């Protein structure tokens, strides 16, 4: 019979950890994140640490996106506890920009190499949210698996908060009772949900991007990795109306758009060579309707990020189409997502580099970077060079396809000068001519002698539809 976890009050967690790790200089704590963030545990532990006169052991909190309150990044806590964030927003992003939290650069597919046995951030403690099946007694990590298996396998103390209203998902989200040491059942906060996208009213620029991707790259039987956000929603909306069949899903984040396609039967996963018959994801994030959909549904199964983002797995589900967005792209094909500029951290790299490198041969599929040509303030997202000091998710040697509302720049196999011409050609018209002149006049950018201004360069397909911006 499996050992059952000990039920404790959330206020007791800090004392349990102080007693267990008495004499240690620091404690590495991995926190389950995203929609299933264990906010009750985070708040209770933070309050206890703040009230304690002890400064040792020091708590290092490793995590992904934490949507709720994150008291341990507040001012005055950093001599006792600090965030090491792989992906950030809200309070953690602000704290990182003010020096009260660390950004820990890591792709989602490589988290296990950072927190695994003997690694710098091997967890001593894991905090997570779980739900439980009233039929089998099994626990499920529900909406977020990410790297929790690796964390649990190598940690000494596992603390869970039980949220019986969280969806019970299948696959590798399911764990037995003996995997949990302590469980909190009172004062638990609900999972985080977000408004469902309006797929019928997608803005013109995003819709154009969706049309370009759907018409040029999506095929019957393709496997998709599509994130969440306005541009991925536009791709979903276009696929919905385009008549595709037998699509599959292998993705980090499963959102409302993929649910809509699966409900319509457009996604059925029949053609996937691996994990045939069900969508695979590592995180679910979106609306209440989405959470109701994935609850107990065998057609959507959870896997760790090291699996969903694995090049070996991706290459077994060809043709594979990966769609991600970015902060910007430069003339050389460099892409950045984590920073707006060297002084302003924004989020993290997610799994974008994992999929770009997994699809480094056209035989495997297409890694697409989809961006609007300008920011909301009218600044070009295509620039001559990336901001100095920012980390890159794709470099000039990565074979990517860039899509804006003005066209497609397929950079695969192009020389440096042709890459620059291709990227500049899909810039916003307010910038395009100046960019092209800059490239043509630059002797360092080797171009064909036959190139004439106004020609469409190799690799470029301009938007020719009717959607207005």
Q: What role is predicted for each listed range?
A:
Residues 1-469:
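Conserved alpha/beta enzyme-core scaffold
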């Amino acid at each position: 019979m499996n050992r059952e976890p000990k039920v404790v009050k959330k206020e007791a967690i800090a004392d349990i950890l102080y007693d267990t790790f008495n004499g240690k200089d620091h404690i590495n704590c991995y926190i389950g994140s995203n929609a299933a963030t264990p906010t009750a545990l985070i708040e209770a532990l933070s309050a206890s640490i703040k009230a304690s006169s002890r400064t040792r052991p020091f708590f290092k909190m490793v995590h992904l996106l934490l949507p709720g309150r994150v008291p341990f990044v507040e001012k005055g806590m950093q001599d006792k506890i600090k965030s090491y964030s792989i992906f950030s927003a809200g309070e953690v992003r602000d704290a990182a920009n003010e020096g009260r939290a660390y950004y820990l650069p890591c792709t989602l597919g490589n988290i296990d190499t950072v927190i695994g046995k003997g690694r710098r951030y091997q967890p001593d403690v894991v905090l997570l949210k779980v739900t439980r099946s009233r039929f089998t007694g099994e626990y499920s990590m529900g909406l977020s698996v990410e790297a929790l298996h690796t964390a649990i396998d190598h940690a000494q103390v596992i603390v869970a908060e039980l949220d019986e209203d969280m969806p019970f998902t299948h696959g590798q989200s399911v764990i037995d009772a003996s995997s949990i040491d302590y469980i909190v059942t009172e004062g638990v906060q609900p999972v985080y949900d977000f408004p469902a996208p309006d797929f019928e009213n997608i803005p013109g620029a995003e819709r154009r991007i969706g049309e370009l991707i759907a018409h040029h790259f999506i095929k019957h039987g393709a496997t998709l990795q599509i994130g969440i956000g306005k541009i991925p929603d536009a791709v979903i909306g276009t696929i919905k109306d385009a008549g595709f069949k037998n699509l599959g899903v292998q993705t980090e984040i499963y959102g409302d758009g993929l649910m809509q396609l699966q409900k319509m039967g457009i996604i059925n996963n029949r053609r996937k060579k691996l994990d045939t018959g069900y969508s695979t994801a590592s995180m679910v994030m979106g609306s209440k309707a989405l959470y109701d959909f994935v609850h107990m549904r065998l057609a959507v199964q959870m896997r760790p990020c090291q699996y969903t983002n694995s090049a070996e797995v991706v290459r077994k589900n060809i043709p594979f189409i990966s769609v991600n967005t970015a902060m910007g792209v430069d003339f050389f094909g460099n892409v950045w997502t984590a920073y707006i500029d060297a002084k302003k951290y924004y989020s993290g790299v997610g799994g974008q580099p994992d999929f770009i490198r997994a699809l480094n041969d056209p035989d495997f599929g297409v890694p697409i970077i989809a961006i609007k040509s300008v920011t909301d303030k009218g600044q070009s997202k295509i620039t001559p060079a990336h901001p100095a000091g920012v980390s890159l998710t794709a470099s000039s040697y990565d074979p990517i396809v860039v899509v804006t509302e003005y066209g497609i720049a397929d950079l695969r196999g192009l020389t440096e000068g042709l890459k620059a011409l291709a990227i500049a050609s899909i810039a916003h018209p307010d910038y395009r001519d100046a960019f092209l002149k800059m490239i043509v006049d630059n002797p360092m950018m080797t171009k064909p002698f036959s190139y004439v201004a106004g020609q469409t360069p190799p690799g470029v397909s301009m938007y020719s539809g009717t959607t207005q911006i």
